[in-house]
């Protein structure tokens, strides 16, 4: 039996609160069960040096966890003097995912940075970050239109992500921490809202997985992502 008696294909309760802070152009608190992530999108004029003069914009991301987001306190990475490999991998994943949702040429020479700060972690922090960051990005782009910086939003599609895995031989969707830590196979799937995939990260933690299990996990992810897209679009109506 899963925590909270969830079915194998069921995502956790999703709450997306927009305009959570007042300064950022886009600000979202996203909650997947007990995982809570604050996603703030900042718009700045100019682009990184490697894009100067090319007439296109850039979307990037940073990711971090508050010291007491987990059961025991973890020192801030700034106090250690460097980011961990895990942090760098996650923020690159978030950034790649968001760039797939935006027409960078239509964005023009602006940079949008989405900061994803994990307030509370209970599994799926990177996937929750992507799903919440997309909504914050939409709000930031819409604000650029309202302020006259853009004629229309360069958003091409919504993007969301979910974790899936095999626990005790059973494929499950949207893993909580206790499930994730016991998973024989762990996978993160990023998708745009027409069903096409941006990224699939799959690792056999305890035992190799078969082609049939891979297809089952991807099918679970697709079903879960449809629910997440619904939650995103419902939040954007409010």
Swiss-Prot record:
Signal peptide region: none
Enzyme class: transferase
Documented EC number(s): 2.7.7.56
CDD domains per record: RNase_PH_bact
InterPro entries: ExoRNase_PH_dom1 (IPR001247), ExoRNase_PH_dom2 (IPR015847), ExoRNase_PH_dom2_sf (IPR036345), PNPase/RNase_PH_dom_sf (IPR027408), Ribosomal_Su5_D2-typ_SF (IPR020568), RNase_PH (IPR050080), RNase_PH_bac-type (IPR002381), RNase_PH_CS (IPR018336)
A Pfam family it matches: RNase_PH_C
Record-listed phosphate binding positions: 86, 124-126
Coiled coil ranges: none
Gene Ontology BP annotations: rRNA catabolic process; rRNA processing; tRNA processing
GO molecular function list: 3'-5'-RNA exonuclease activity; tRNA binding; tRNA nucleotidyltransferase activity
Catalytic activity line of the entry: tRNA(n+1) + phosphate = tRNA(n) + a ribonucleoside 5'-diphosphate
Keyword list, A-Z: Nucleotidyltransferase, RNA-binding, rRNA processing, Transferase, tRNA processing, tRNA-binding
Homology family: Belongs to the RNase PH family.
Known partners and oligomeric status: Homohexameric ring arranged as a trimer of dimers.
Purpose: Phosphorolytic 3'-5' exoribonuclease that plays an important role in tRNA 3'-end maturation. Removes nucleotide residues following the 3'-CCA terminus of tRNAs; can also add nucleotides to the ends of RNA molecules by using nucleoside diphosphates as substrates, but this may not be physiologically important. Probably plays a role in initiation of 16S rRNA degradation (leading to ribosome degradation) during starvation.
Full protein name: Ribonuclease PH
Species of origin: Proteus mirabilis (strain HI4320)
